[in-house]
Amino acid sequence: MNNTDRIRRVQSAIMTGATALCTVLAVGALLIILSYIAWQGIGSLNFRFLIDSPKPVGEGGGIGNAILGSLVLLGLSSVIGLPLGICVGVYLSEIGRGRFGGAVRFIVDTLTGIPSIVTGVFVYAILVLPMKHFSALAGGVALALIMVPIVARTTEEMLKLVPHSLREGALALGAPQWRVTLGVVIPAAAPGIATGAMLAIARVSGETAPLLFTAFGSRFFPTTLDEPIASLTVQIYNYAISPYDEWHAQAWAATLVLMTLVLGINIIVRVLTRRRF
C-alpha cells in the first residue's frame, strides 16, 4: 500500500466518522427533545383532557376546543392554500416563461422567506380591522398565505421531474397543452404534489404568531367561522407564560398532542414519498 492509498483511507475514515458523529448529534438532539416533551406531558394526558374545554385555574379542563379549532384552521387553510399553490406551481412549471414568469417565481420565493408574524399583521390589516373582530376565517387566510409558496415550489419541482417523453408522446397524439398538463403531467407528479401539500400542512400546524393577530383564541368550542377560535399553538403559548403550575402541566400535554399530530403528518409524507414516477 503506497502513501496515496493510506492518505485516501485516512481521509475516508475521518469523513465517515464526522458524518456519523453529525448524524448521532442530530438524531440524539431530536430524541432528547421528544423524550422530554413526552415525560413532561404524559402525566396530564387523558381522554377527558382531549375532549373537555378549558376551565379556570385548578385541576381539570382540557384542550378539546383547541384541537377542534386547529383542525378547522388547518382545513380552512388547506381549502384556500392548496389549490392556489398547486395552480401557481403548475403555471411556473408548464406555462410561466419570460419576465412575468420570473416575477411570479420571485414573489413566491420572497413569500417563502417572509416571517410568519408579518403575514399575520398583513391579514390583520386587510381582514380583522375591516371586520372589527378576530375570526377563524382570518386565521385560515393567514395560514393559507404561508402555505401557498411552499406548495407552489414543491409542485413546480415535482412537475419538472416528470419525463419530457410523457409530454411529447401526448402532444404527438394530438392532445392540446391543457389536456396534457391535466391528464398526463399532473397525475404523474401526484405523489410528489401530495407530499408537498402534507409538508405545508405540517409547517403551518405549528404557527402561533399569525394566529395571535387573526384567530386570537377562545375558551369555547367553535360554532362559526366568523368568531375567534382556539388553536393548540396559541393555547400552549398562553398556558406556558401563565404563572400557574396546573396550566404549565397542561401546556406540556398540549405540546405532546401537537407533536404527535406533526409526527403523524410526517409519517404520511414518508409513506407517500415511497412512490416514484
Where are these regions (language model features)?
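Hydrophobic positions within alpha-helical transmembrane segments of bacterial inner-membrane proteins
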Residues: 28, 70, 74, 78-90, ...
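Periplasmic/extracellular loop-to-transmembrane helix junction in inner-membrane transport proteins
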Residues: 2-21, 36-79, 97, 235-249
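Cytoplasmic-entry segments and transmembrane alpha-helices of multi-pass inner-membrane transporters
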Residues: 17, 84-123, 150-157
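Interhelical loop and adjacent transmembrane-helix boundary motif
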Residues: 54-57, 61, 211-259
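C-terminal transmembrane helix and the adjacent membrane-cytosol boundary/short C-terminal tail
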Residues: 14, 156-160, 171, 195-198, ...
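Transmembrane alpha-helices
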Residues: 155, 177-214
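Generic hydrophobic transmembrane alpha-helix motif, especially the helices
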Residues: 109-145
